[in-house]
Each structure stands twice: as structure tokens, then as C-alpha cells.
A protein has these predicted regions:
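A short, structural micro-pattern
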Residues: 49-51, 99, 136
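A cross-family signal for N-terminal binding/gating loops and helix N-caps
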Residues: 4
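HotDog/MaoC-like acyl-thioester-processing domains
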Residues: 7-94, 144-153, 159-163
């Protein structure tokens, strides 16, 4: 069995400065069925939160590729923390009206991880290539629907929201 990242939401109040000392922490806050929920926090030296995230992981049976519930023994090993204060977006992302279809991306070997599918971080890099250079991203949401493999094609859709 393996925990697989299903979705995440990252909020950056500000970006850390080059050489700035920051503290990063993470803690699970809930388990429901085959899903595990985890928060991440980045703080500056004064303890002020500068970035934070929410994530959803699914426990997958490696043999069947189906979701499975964690055992009581597994759950006992986790120390649950408090859910952090943030504006939690819905888990599923709806493509907004007016989103523009981007240029198709052929998946190449450098996009892949050790499991031979696109690495989580590569999806973000691909998405960042679709937005104007120099744009400061303050919030990022990612939803993984299926594994993408070598020589498959990703089709990005781009939409900008003013905040």
C-alpha cells in the first residue's frame, strides 16, 4: 500500500527572501475512509506564517490499484494535529468558463518519477510555463485525476482570477 497525493492547495502570503531562515512543518489532521488530510506551514524567524497548504492523500493498494482504508494499527501511529485556519477550497477543481486551451505537452522521460508516471512537481512546472513570466502566484491548486505516463499528452487550460 502507498499514500498517493490526490490534491493540494498552497497559499503564499509572501515568498521567503533569498537566505532567509524559515521553519517548515507538517501534520495530519484527519482520516476519512481511504483519505488522509495534511496541512503544511512555513513560518519566518518571528513565527509569522508566510505560506501554508492543505493536501489530500489517498491510500492505494499496490496490487489492485484500488483505494483502501488504513488499518487501526496504521492510524495509531499518526498524531493528529489541529486543522489550520485557512480558506479551504473545494477538493475538486472546475475548469472556469473562459479558460483558454493551452499548447499540448508531450510527456518525455524528464517528466517521470521512479514509478514511470509524471512527478507531482512536474505538473506544477508545466502549469507555470502556461502563465505569464514574472506573475506572482499567491495561490495554487492541483487535483490529480489519473496517472500520466511517457508519450501521453497533457492539455492545459489557463484561467486567471483576480484577488
Amino acid at each position: 500500500m502507498v499514500w498517493v497525493l490526490s490534491s493540494w492547495q498552497i497559499v503564499a502570503e509572501r515568498y521567503p527572501l533569498l537566505g532567509e531562515t524559515v521553519t517548515v512543518g507538517t501534520q495530519p489532521y484527519e482520516f476519512r475512509s481511504f483519505m488522509g488530510f495534511r496541512n503544511f506551514v512555513m513560518e519566518d524567524e518571528a513565527g509569522k506564517r508566510i505560506a501554508y497548504a492543505n493536501s489530500l492523500f489517498s491510500l492505494i493498494d499496490i496490487e489492485t490499484a484500488h483505494p483502501m482504508r488504513p488499518t487501526e494499527e496504521m492510524l495509531e501511529k499518526y498524531v493528529l494535529g489541529e486543522k489550520i485556519q485557512m480558506d479551504y477550497a473545494p477538493r475538486k477543481i472546475t475548469i472556469p468558463d473562459g479558460a483558454v486551451k493551452g499548447e499540448e505537452i508531450l510527456i518525455l522521460p524528464h517528466h517521470l518519477d521512479v514509478n514511470h508516471h509524471v512527478n507531482n512537481g512536474q505538473y506544477v512546472r508545466i502549469a507555470m510555463d502556461c502563465v505569464p513570466k514574472g506573475l506572482k502566484i499567491r495561490q495554487l491548486r492541483v487535483e490529480y485525476k489519473k496517472q500520466v505516463r511517457l508519450h501521453e499528452v497533457l492539455v492545459p487550460y489557463v484561467s486567471r482570477t483576480e484577488t
